[in-house]
Amino acid sequence: MAIVKVKPTSPGRRAMVKVVNKDLHQGKPHAALLDTQSSTAGRNNNGRITTRHKGGGHKHHYRIVDFRRTKDGIPAKVERLEYDPNRSANIALVLYADGERRYIIAPKGLTVGQQLMSGSEAPIRAGNTLPIRNIPVGTTIHCIEMLPGKGAQMARSAGTSAMLLAREGVYAQVRLRSGEIRRVHIECRATIGEVGNEEHSLRQIGKAGANRWRGIRPTVRGVAMNPVDHPHGGGEGKTAAGRDPVSPWGTPTKGYRTRSNKRTTTMIVQRRHKR
């Protein structure tokens, strides 16, 4: 993997920094593990914008990634590493001994030809998936389930990981990259190691068009709008917001807590804000 600073042939390319990985597969993805996805452009079923700054972008297929890793006791061989346009992490195509192929999140250090295993008897090695009750305390893990059998939901982005801190009864404590310490049931599964493609954060977009390719539209400041469009809008000439920062709907922003799910609050041992 190499970090390439592009030759400044234009203003848009002058600041561009790319992450090039020669080990990724250059051909087409595995057709049996593709699915179609339509662009919603941030609209719901009523046609109203529910997520701003989305729209356009290049069409791409969804890669069906195995987040459950339930083929216990069946060894798998890594056939190739691939780019996935739907996520920051790379994915790996693995071939199981029974002939089935699946995509998984590629952990750091994974190589073509490497053997992987899942289940309670799997060795403690990067890329193997085990129930948390079988993972030693202090191990770095990723792709962590929040409910047994639901599939991995935490620590799935490029370069992320978590650490298994302790086990108490039927729960284990996991420290996430944000600093939050969370309780997880010991029957939940996790994968050993950290997610690969950690250089993803070092890339520089370089020009606005590169974000448009990704389906990201411009973000307009509230003070540049009219009063009808944003609480910060209006005024003669350049003016400040005139109030504490708020969202377009008047909710305080920059540190204001909006978490409303009280049902799972007991699973958070220490918040990431440490207040």
UniProtKB/Swiss-Prot annotation:
SUPFAM superfamilies, per database record: Nucleic acid-binding proteins, Translation proteins SH3-like domain
Annotated keywords: Ribonucleoprotein, Ribosomal protein, RNA-binding, rRNA-binding
Compositional bias of kind Basic residues: 50-59
InterPro entries in alphabetical order: NA-bd_OB-fold, Rib_uL2_dom2, Ribosomal_uL2, Ribosomal_uL2_bac/org-type, Ribosomal_uL2_C, Ribosomal_uL2_CS, Ribosomal_uL2_dom3, Ribosomal_uL2_RNA-bd_dom
Polar residues bias: start-end ranges: 36-49
An example Gene Ontology molecular-function term: rRNA binding
GO CC annotation: large ribosomal subunit
Region described as Disordered: spans on this chain: 36-59, 224-275
Biological process according to GO: cytoplasmic translation
Summary of subunit composition and partner proteins: Part of the 50S ribosomal subunit. Forms a bridge to the 30S subunit in the 70S ribosome.
Protein family according to the UniProt entry: Belongs to the universal ribosomal protein uL2 family.
Functional note: One of the primary rRNA binding proteins. Required for association of the 30S and 50S subunits to form the 70S ribosome, for tRNA binding and peptide bond formation. It has been suggested to have peptidyltransferase activity; this is somewhat controversial. Makes several contacts with the 16S rRNA in the 70S ribosome.
Protein name in UniProt: Large ribosomal subunit protein uL2
Organism name: Burkholderia vietnamiensis (strain G4 / LMG 22486)
